[in-house]
Amino acid sequence: MFKKLSYLAIFLSSAFIYAQEEEEVVVTGSYIAGSPTDGASPVEIVGRDLIDNIGAMTASDITANLPIDSGSENNADSFTSGATQGRTNINLRGLGLTSTLVLIDGRRVTFSGSIANDGSAFVDTSQIPTIALDRVEILKEGAASIYGSDAVAGVVNYIFRRDFVGFETDITRQQIEAGSARDDRVSFIYGGEFGDSNVVLAYSSLDRSPMLGTEKELAPMGISGLGTSFRLLSGTTTAAAGHPYAGTYTHNPNGLTDPPNTYIRDPNCVANKGIVLADGRCGFKFGPRFNIVNEENHEQIYLSIKRPLTDEIDFNLDVLDATTNVWDNPQSPSYPALTFLSLAKLIQPGTGGSPFDKALLWYGRPLANLFPSPLAPRYISRDRISLGLTGTFDNGFDWDFRVTRSAEDAYGLQPDTGTSQLEDAIAGKGGPTGDQTFDLFIPTNNSQELIDWLRSDQETWTDVELEVVDFVVTGEVGNVAIATGIQLREESIDIDRSANSLVVLDANGNLVTPANMIFLGGGIEVDTSKSAEAIFVEASADINENLEIRGALRYESLEEESTVDPKISLRYQASDNVVLRASVSQSYREPTLAQLYASDVGLEGIQDYNTNGETVGNATFIRIAAKANPNLVPEEADNLNVGVIWTLDDFQAKFDYWAVDYTNVITKEQAQGIVRYTPQSTKVIRTSGTLAGVTTSYFNADYVETDGIDIELTYSADIGPGTLGLGLNATHMMSYDIPILGVKTDVVGLFNQDNFARSMPDTKAVISANYLSGQHSVAAYVRHISSYKTNAALNSTAQSLGIFNADGSIDSFTTVDMQYTYAVDAENVALTVGLKNAFDEDVPYVYDATNWSYDPKHHDPRGRMFTLGLKYMLD
C-alpha cells in the first residue's frame, strides 16, 4: 500500500504541472495558500505577544488561557491522574483528550506512553519549550478531511520560531505564596544566518519545587478505613495482659451496629496519628501525604536548520528533545492489603504478631501513620526529528515532502508490598533468612530489614513511536486553488513490566493470575503496532467576489477499517464589515493501541452503594481492572459550524455556533457508575462484603451530542501616549447529551463522577486588557469558570466537615492575573513582575469521594503566585 500511494503522489504532482504560481500562506485547517484567519473555518491564534503577556512558563499556561479547553489534566493529581504525573495535555470542547489532534509545525506527534484514568491517550504538551514558540493556532472544528484520525474536536498546532534571527535569554521565577514552592526557568533562543542557511537553537530548563499536601487542606476526605484494625467474625476473643490490645472483645451478631465489639482497632489509634472512624475502625489519613505540586525538572532543546539545496529545492530539519523528571511524588507508607480481605486469609492466633486466641479478618495495611512516605518517581524522555524537502515545479506548483519521527521512552515506579512476601512474613517465614515475623499489631516492632524485604514495587517501561511520511502538492488550476497529498503512518507501543506486576488474563480478558502486590493491580506486557495510509484532496474557489467555497475529501485505510471524510465550507462577504461563514464535515478517530491491547489494573477512589441507592461506608481506593478490546471500531462524528464576523474600525466580534454529533464513542466503563447503579453486577468484586474491585472494559458508547457558542471580541485604540487592547474570549456549552442507563441525559453543568464524561462547567471565559506605552507594558486577565454541581450524596464524613455545599453545587471560580513589563531600550533588557491569582482566590470545594476535594481538571489550586522575570535581547 505504501508503494502504491507513493506512485499515486508522483502522478498527482505531475497532473498539476501547468498550474499558476502563488506564494504560500497556510493557516491550520487547510493546506491551501492564502487561507485567512477570518476565513470559513474558525481559527484562534495565540501569538508571541500574548504568550509573553500571560507569563506562560509552560504550554499548560497557554492552555489555561483557552476557554475552549475543558477537562484537560494540567495539575498534579496523584488520585485520578497518577499514571500521567509530569505530563500535560489539552481537551477541546471536553470531547476527550484523544479527540484533539496536536501538531508541531503542522506535523503529527506521538501519543504519550501513559494514558489517563479514563483510558484516553494524548500528546504530552509539556515537551513544548515556550521560548521557541512563535504562535499557537487552534482550529475549533473537526478536520479529519485534512489531517485524518483524532481531529474530531479540533486541532492545536504549536508553531515554532523557525525564522528567528538574534539572541534572547530569559530568567524567570514564579513563587507560590502559600509555602515555599516555586518554578525557576532559564531559557534562551538563538537564530543566525550563515550564508544561505538559517539556524535556530533554543533551550529551556524549568525546576519546580514541591507544594506539600500539608500546606493547603485540599484532601480532607483522603481517609481510608483500612488503617490499623481487625474484625472479629464470631464469639469472643481475648488478648493477654501486657499487650497494647489487652482485653476481651465480643462479636456483635447484629452486624456493625456496635462497632467497638465488632472491629478491634489500634488501642492507641489517635496517639499513633490515626483517626477513629464512625464504625469504630482506626483509619488512615493519607490526603496530606500527597503533593499538590510535585518536585519536577523539565528540559527542552529545539534545533531548526533551513537551507537551499538547489535553486528549486529547500532543505529543512527540525529536532526537539525533551525530558521530564518527577523526583518525589510521595505515596502512602504502604497501601491497603486488599488481597487479605478474604476469609481464606484470616490472621490466625500466633501469626502476624497476633495476641488473640481467635482468627481475625485484617482491615489494614502493613505500614500506616507512623511511617514515612515512599516516592513514586517518573522519568520521561522524548525526541522528535522532522526532515523535509520543499520545492517548486518549473510552472510554479509547490510541493512539500517530509518524514517525521517522534518517540517517548518512559519509566515509572509505584511502591507496593508483595503478597507472597507478606504471607510468608505473617507466617514467620519472612526476611532474607526466612525466619522473621511481621507484626501487624505493633508495626514499630518490625526491623527495617524486614520492611525492605516486603517491598514489591511496580515498575513500568513504556516506549511509543510514531513515524509519518507526508507529501503535499499545492497550486492553482484556473481559478481553483488545489491541495492534494498522501500520508503514511506507523505507530507502535511497547510496554514492559517488572515480573511481580505481571498478570495473566483468560481469553475473555478476565483476571486469572493476579500480580504479586497487595494493592496495585499490574497489567500485561504489550508489543504491537498499527499503520494507516491516506490520500486527500482540497479545493477552494471564489464563486464571485463575495462568496468563497472550500471542499476537502480524505480517504484513509486502516488495518481493519477504512474511512472517507468530507468537508465543505463557505465564506460570504456580506458587506464591508460583515463576514458570514459555515462549514459541515465528518470526522473520525481510530482506537489507540492501548485501548485495543493494553489491559491493566489501576486504582480509583470509589464510594460503595447498596441496591436502594444508599451509600455504604466511606469511599476507598480499590482496584479497577480495565480490559482492552480488540473489537473496537472507529468513532465517527458530524461537525457543524455557523458563524458571523463583524469588523468596525478597531473592533472585531466573532460569534460561532458549533455542534458535534458523535457516534461509536470509544470510552472506558465508569467504575463509580457501575457500583452506584448496578451494585450487584458481576463486575463488582466484593470480599467478605467489602468492596474490593471493579472490572471495566473499553467499549463503543452509543453517542455524544453536543453544541455551544464561541465568542471572541477584540478592540484596540490609541489612548494617551499608548495603545489599549481589550478582549473577551468565551465558550458556552449548551448541551452535552450522552446515554446513561439507556436514557439520553444532558450532563453540561455536572461533575460527572458516575459516567464517562468529564466534569463540565457550562461557561469558561477570559477577559483581557493590556496597555502599551513606550517602554511600559501592563496586562491583566480575568479568567472565569462557571459553577456546576455533583449529584453524589454527601456521606456522614463529608457532612461533618461542613465545607461542601449541601445541594452538591460547586462554586464558580474567577481569578485575576496582572503583569507589568519595563523595557530598558539602551540595555536590551526587559524586567517583568507579575501576579497570578492576584486576589488569592481559593479553589471551590468538590465532593469527590477520597480524591482531592477540588477539581484538578478545571481549577488551579496553587493560589496567589508572584513572578519576576529578566529578559535580555540582541538583534
Residue positions per predicted region:
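N-terminal periplasmic "start-of-domain" segments of outer-membrane beta-barrel proteins
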Residues: 24-54, 60, 112-117
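Extracytoplasmic beta-strand/coil segments of soluble accessory domains associated
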Residues: 35, 64-108
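N-terminal periplasmic accessory domains that precede
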Residues: 59-62, 90-91, 123-126, 150-171, ...
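Short acidic/polar hinge/loop motifs at secondary-structure boundaries
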Residues: 107-140
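Surface-exposed, low-complexity loop segments enriched in small/polar and acidic residues
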Residues: 117, 222-224, 262, 266-296, ...
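C-terminal beta-signal and terminal closure region of outer-membrane beta-barrel proteins
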Residues: 413-415, 421, 585, 602, ...
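Gram-negative outer-membrane beta-barrel transporters
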Residues: 657-794, 871
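C-terminal beta-signal and adjacent terminal beta-strands/loops
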Residues: 734-735, 784-796, 821-875
